[in-house]
Amino acid sequence: MAADWLGSIVSINCGDSLGVYQGRVSAVDQVSQTISLTRPFHNGVKCLVPEVTFRAGDITELKILEIPGPGGNQHFGDVHQTELGPSGVGCQVGISQNGTGKLVKKPTSSSSAPQNIPKRTDVKSQDVAVSPQQQQCSKSYVDRHMESLSQSKSFRRRHNSWSSSSRHPNQATPKKSGLKNGQMKNKDDECFGDDIEEIPDTDFDFEGNLALFDKAAVFEEIGTYERRSGTRSRGIPNERPTRYRHDENILESEPIVYRRITVPHNVSKEFCTDSGLVVPSVSYEQHKKLLSVAEKHGLTLERRLEMTGVCASQMALTLLGGPNRLNPKNVHQRPTVALLCGPHVKGAQGISCGRHLANHDVQVILFLPNFVKMLESITNELSLFSKTQGQQVSSLKDLPTSPVDLVINCLDCPENVFLRDQPWYKAAVAWANQNRAPVLSIDPPVHEVEQGIDAKWSLALGLPLPLGEHAGRIYLCDIGIPQQVFQEVGINYHSPFGCKFVIPLHSA
């Protein structure tokens, strides 16, 4: 008789401690009073084990949810109820009169002899009147759970499958002709099948497992093994191997000499470059002698003016913003530069710088006072400047009242100190100090008494003068004086410029 209930789907309530199990009956042992379920569900969740066994003493309530028949599975109502007590196993099947299919509990017999579960033929022979409402509510909990599980499985399947979208649920899948189609179906089942018995409930803890791995110990063990075996060591995490740039020589070089320039007289002030090279300052007399000897060897005033103008214009273009400011997209925002030049050689250097700036699409306004007689160098530079789009003015009233982008100061000359008392000079200094634009001084002299225009940057030629704080940040430009010319005036010289023509200097 126990074999008649094999294959039935039941629900077993084992109390609050063990919970509720559902599954298909796989074995019933009347001697040991046990029942086994295959593919069980515990509280609605599929168990990881394929089969579970229950003792009669642990079962509080047993429901028969489905009894298989010879023609297929027959669905019964929700009211198949069985109680298993410590003394025996009993079963009572019935439907309530109101047609809702509620469960009716009755205590089991107190007899010590085990009672057999009635045959399924007896249950079939009972005449049970089921209303249409009962037929709509006749699906059991396991049926609904199995349907939801099958729907979730079909959701995980590929959505472009014809079998899961277009055919009727009870319709068989049409077979494809040919051996190849059968092989493809087998491969699809192997790839997309859901016959997974055990699904882990928790995700893999990557961080926790990574923390268990001691990298330092493993690398140390590898390094020890390689040192013992004589193989090349790949290093340990605490070691930082020496790395060389693509342009760096891996061979050891001679010690670096930072003091490559020496002057014959005492140095009042020293500077250093970004690479650490020491650049001493020279007095105005030494600097004047150096330029005179260079001019005697062919570095004429015209060449010096051209080199000074190129280097000064390059520095000015960088200060104006470089390629970020001077590009075709900013044609409507041309930078404006005001040049303040005196009637001397230093003023001619400023005019040369203004010409190069005007050639680079910079709006240049040149101030130069009117004099009856001008130097030849100034006349030549003015002739070239007039061929550009730059503007030349001789009155301070013609200078812009709004702040410009940059002011270049070339008013001062140590040989023409008397010019500082001129009204135009004082007016130009006052205009530059009132204007909020930064000031660049080209080849400024050393003032015993600080006066005039305070510069933000100063550009020295060849070697710097001992400039004070009023000169701002000092830059040095290469005007093309050969090394032997330095040696001729008693200066041991080695170029500190490297690949540049203008370099910054820092106070040593």
From Swiss-Prot:
Which CDD domains does the protein's record reference?
LSm16_N
Record has Zinc as a keyword: no
Q: Segment Required for interaction with DDX6: which positions? A: 191-296
Question: What PROSITE patterns does this protein map onto?
Answer: DFDF, SM, YJEF_N
Its subcellular locations are:
Cytoplasm, P-body
Q: Give the DFDF domain ranges.
A: 192-228
Phosphoprotein as UniProt keyword? yes
Q: Which GO terms describe its biological process?
A: deadenylation-independent decapping of nuclear-transcribed mRNA; P-body assembly
Where are the stretches annotated Required for P-body targeting and interaction with DCP1A? 1-79
Q: Output the SMART domains linked to this UniProt entry.
A: FDF, LSM14
An example Gene Ontology CC term for this record: P-body
For this protein, the parts annotated as crossing the membrane are none
Gene Ontology MF term list: mRNA binding
Which keywords does this Swiss-Prot/TrEMBL entry list? Answer: Cytoplasm, Phosphoprotein, RNA-binding
The primary site where this protein sits is cytoplasm
Q: Which residues form the YjeF N-terminal domain?
A: 283-487
Chain spans, region Disordered: 95-192
Q: Which Pfam families match?
A: Edc3_linker, FDF, LSM14, YjeF_N
Which InterPro entries does the entry link to? DFDF, FDF_dom, Lsm14-like_N, Lsm16_N, Sm, YjeF_N_dom, YjeF_N_dom_sf
Domain commentary: The DFDF domain is unstructured by itself. It assumes a helical fold upon interaction with DDX6.
| Subunit structure of this chain's protein | Homodimer (via YjeF N-terminal domain). Forms a complex with DCP1A, DCP2, DDX6 and EDC4/HEDLS, within this complex directly interacts with DCP1A and DDX6. Interacts with ZFP36.
| Family per similarity comment | Belongs to the EDC3 family.
Q: What does this protein do?
A: Binds single-stranded RNA. Involved in the process of mRNA degradation and in the positive regulation of mRNA decapping.
- How is this protein named in the record? Enhancer of mRNA-decapping protein 3
Species this protein is from? Macaca fascicularis
